[in-house]
Amino acid sequence: MHELSITEELLKTIVAKAEEAKARNVSRINLVIGEYAGVVEDSVKMCFEILSQDTIANGAVLEFSRIPAKFRCRLCGHTFPSGQNLLVCPECQGWNAEVIAGNEFFIESIEVDDESQSS
């Protein structure tokens, strides 16, 4: 399960950014996952719950947004979404398409409670 190593790196980044901002704790993390990123949301959530214990991210809510896959035909340049004929260009029927969106996986935002806020 590669989600474990992905989540470990994700947590390192989140904790580092939160500490840099002098946060008291992390309350929400907004993640973006491309349709073809190969990342399973439930696995990331499970790994995050376990790995974030005893960190300032413990109890933070993970929110996921999806980016649909998009392709560009290398033969005619037409761009198109994924569909029934996965990599077949609907314009020229060519089979030589490249993925131009949908492989992404990144942190969109981190919501924190800072030290200046009262309990």
Curated annotation (Swiss-Prot):
UniProtKB keywords: Metal-binding, Nickel, Zinc
Biological process, per Gene Ontology: protein maturation; protein modification process
PROSITE patterns for this protein: HYPA (PS01249)
InterPro entries found in the cross-reference section: Hydgase_Ni_incorp_HypA/HybF_CS, HypA/HybF
Ligand binding (Ni(2+)): 2
Record has Zinc as a keyword: yes
UniProt: Zn(2+) binding residues: 73, 76, 89, 92
Molecular-function GO terms, alphabetical: nickel cation binding; zinc ion binding
Function: Involved in the maturation of [NiFe] hydrogenases. Required for nickel insertion into the metal center of the hydrogenase.
UniProt similarity note: Belongs to the HypA/HybF family.
NCBIfam families linked: hypA
Protein name: Hydrogenase maturation factor HypA
Organism encoding this protein: Dehalococcoides mccartyi (strain CBDB1)
